[in-house]
Amino acid sequence: MHALPALPVLYSFRRCPYAMRARLALAISGEPHEHREVVLKNKPAAMLAASPKGTVPVLVLPDGEVLDESLDIMRWALARNDPAQWLSPPEVAAHETEALIAGNDGDFKRHLDRYKYPNRYPDESGGDAAGFALQHRSAANGWLAQLDTQLHKGWLMGDRASLADMAILPFIRQFAHTDAEWFAAQPWPRLQGWLAAFEASALYQSVMGKHAAWQPELSNS
C-alpha cells in the first residue's frame, strides 16, 4: 500500500491544454504541489491507480482525494487562494462563465481535434484528411470570431483575466499553433493580441518549463 503524499501530486503533460489550464490555476494560487510529467504512451501505474481513465491532469490530494477533471483542479486551487480574483470576474454572473467554457470544451474542442489531428478520424474524413482538417478549421471560425468580439475590453469577462480566459486560452493556443501563419492572417485582432499577451506573460512561462518524465523509482513517495 502506497503512503499518501505530503503535498498534492499533479500528473501532467506539458502541451495538453487541459493540463495547462490546471497548471495555470495552481501557479496563480501559489499552491505547493509535486509535478509529475507523464509520457502519454507509458502512463505511470500510480496515475492509473488514482484515475483509471488515464487522462491528464490528475491531482492527488494528501488525504487521498483524486481530482481528475481540469476544471475541478482549477476551482480547487482557486478556492484555496485566488489572488487575481479569477473566480470573481467584474461584470458577469457565474453561469456566463460556465456557458463560455462549455462552448470551448464542446463544439470548439471537437473541431480543434479534427483540425489538428485529422488522421485520427479516418471513418469521418472519407480518405481526405487535409480537406477534412480544413472543413473543421472553417467550422471553428464562428466561435473564434465570437471570442474576438467578446474581448472588446481586453478579456472575455471584462477588463481583467478570469477563470474563463485561463480555461480557454490553452485551447486557442493549440488551434493557433496548428497553422500560425494562417491564424495571424485572420481578422481577429483582439483574439490574436489576447493570445500573444498570454504567451508573453510570466505566468504562462512559469507553467511551460520542460520536465523530465517522472520515474517512480526516483520519487520519495
Q: What is the predicted function of each stretch?
A:
Residues 96-196:
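GST-like fold's C-terminal all-alpha helical module
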Residues 189-221:
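Long hydrophobic alpha-helical segments typical of transmembrane helices together
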Residues 1-134:
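GST-like domain detector, emphasizing the conserved glutathione-binding G-site
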Residues 76, 178, 207:
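Residues that scaffold the ATP/ADP-binding catalytic core of kinase and kinase-like folds
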